[in-house]
């Protein structure tokens, strides 16, 4: 009996995911039982506030739907355990998950340990388990405060928007500020008045007999009579050209100086997301899903499961001394000693960084991308290759450049020519950094040298409005303004799109009408919540809680009272969009009453003013989008051209009440004349694959595709054959690999 008890008493380790569990189990061996919680197991209730404001913001937590079985299995697993190790992620969210596990499972403090590590490698895991600690309640309190703040804003503001704007809308403490940034940029672009200006480019070359004779280069007109000058119109530009054609072009000054171009630091979360978006078109969510898999571990054949990168939610740029030594050895061996700096490069972090965090880097730089490519999906390889190259380049010698500047005088006009050339490639061998296509290398010039004028080209230009935010530039702006943290950038970008407040078109953000209306009303009635600086200060306050500089209740009290007053005032003073409904020059086709413009969560639509007697509605659509005089065969409303994830199609203007739609291509295809032979191009092709927007539950970064097999339809991963996930039915969002 004692032997049986001894056998059943093991140490239990709890992590978030099955993939992470498998990698850690391989390292720890049979002495440990490693279990997965499948992420969060408890949260505030869905259908109530879940916060007792009058009792010091006491939260009420409920086990999440579908997680009862997980909790029951974990309770059974820890019942006879000698020790329980909570090995969730090392950030605030991971600490909160560990605390919730301890509470939900009723774990005794003397048997419960917290282990944290930055990478899932044998060295790191062994070190973490050799010195376990206790749950950091400062981190837990900071995460609790964030969750309650977000719940207060979302749960209390959303009903106001339903009442004043449209049902189904929602507001968020951080997301609403991000939407504001897009809306304000939209207004700047709309209000921008372009101004015409002209550039004059001279093509010049040293004269015969001079060094580099005949080597052409370009110079731009920059000054007239010592003052900055750009012609305002074509007439002024042509007048300048006529004057310049008579002038002698002389070198006033020529300078050459050597400069260096250092590689940027290894990746933080935000820079990884920005670079992956710009380079591969990955959404922040997709980037983080792929990075999660690389961190938790992948099978490398005979080498087994290996964690390939360090923890991917970080704003730190520091690197461990062991990793620095390893990368310096690789640079010396692979590229030569001339590419290795005398001392390692150390980078200064922005803001407040946790000491335990590192930059995102490979767990072993010796594991070169091409060597493990066969074991990775295409997207996993892209991201790993990006991380590996960024880390290696950051510790290589800089690119050495020769910068050239020539100032050229032509009568009362001054031209400027700039050039650069690479003297030593440095990190560019890895980073791929290079000169821009339009950069030139100037010939050898000297002061007072007379040049040959080979041509003058005036070109028309217009001042440009501020650029629209891309995914990368919006994340960069959020980070620079102190809004959000590494774990929140991806959810922010996803949420503002899912709510319909912004849309992403050709990788650029556009504010929707609903987003603009909601933003304007929130700015007017909740200036603090919508203020960028206020939101940044709240983030700093949460950092203070984590660092034990303030109590989490102080943060909540400071926020809640002004928010409550603003909410009460808005209930009375905010004008309902329903009261702003305006008649349009159109009569209801059903009853002849005037139509009015109204607002829903999807945007404006037309409705009959005789509602509720007449319930006719129609999508408010631009005239050019109407599909001629075609009517819906189901309800007689107009058919309009709409855009979906797979292109344009015809849909009913009365959507969502009428869901009729048809292929636009089918209507555009020419009819085959009667009796004409059937051509190959006219044959109907069998549809064998149908993409979806559902992420692969295996976490490989792919999307699910509906395919047809010998036994009927099934769902498979777009990364096949690297990912072999399949399912008979479409999984629900958030389903894990182990659920399938």
Segments (PLM) and residue ranges:
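Short, hydrophobic-biased segments on the C-terminal half of alpha helices
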Residues: 288-292, 493-494
